[in-house]
Amino acid sequence: MAESLMDIKRKIASTKKTGQITQAMQMVSGAKLSQIEKRAKKYQIYSDKVRQIVTHLAAGQLLELANAAESDTDSGDKSQVISVASLLQKRPVKKTGYLVITSDRGLVGSYNSTVLKAMMQMIKDDHESPDDYVMMAIGGVGADFFKARGLNLAYEYRGVSDIPTFNEVREIVKTAVTMFDNGVFDELYVCYNHHVNTLTSAFRAEKMLPISDLDVSEVADTNVEYLIEPDLDSVLESVLPQYAESLIFGAIMDAKTAEHAASTTAM
């Protein structure tokens, strides 16, 4: 009987310790969530301003591309536009790229399973052959998942910090843009959990490349003029890749925010 009481006391003590550890982990996750939410809001302000500037700078190229698509001609001017702003140019899709963002570890509730389940359904619905798509993975859970199923994993990155910086993930975003530019895939979707609030996230598959979120009609709403040196083409060749990189980084920030929220509620 004494031994039985001792066992009960040990279980009670063990349960209390587990509760203390879980509470501490929840507090840490909550602090990280608060920090990254503040940073994500600041980044959104920056991203919106960059988008506005890029839209103004690329307005001429966007109009020429639209006119070229409507007339369906192969003029010399059209090739000039494509060479200057290739990231804007839609091309026949022979292969689709998917950049899938998951966590490196568990204890995040259904965060990873939601993304991976939705991804497998997308592949099943949209592709008949494994040759039609290529995978890129941010996070060990996703990378291991795709490898275990024999999917074409062209790139993986593990160990993104809890509060990522652009310098930290520069390799990821530059690799994605370079692979698109080199024709490894003809369009890129970034797939992740979008942070709605602490209790809710929603799966997103956003088309990032070619750049398609620039609306020329917005230019008419402002009277801003830019002084450009040395010339517009040179500036666009530098700015457009950076803008594409900023879109991908924004998705990584959003996904990381959703991860911390999931970790907080899972405790």
Predicted regions and their residues:
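C-terminal beta-strand-loop-alpha-helix "lid" module of Rossmann-like NAD(P)-dependent dehydrogenases
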Residues: M1-M267
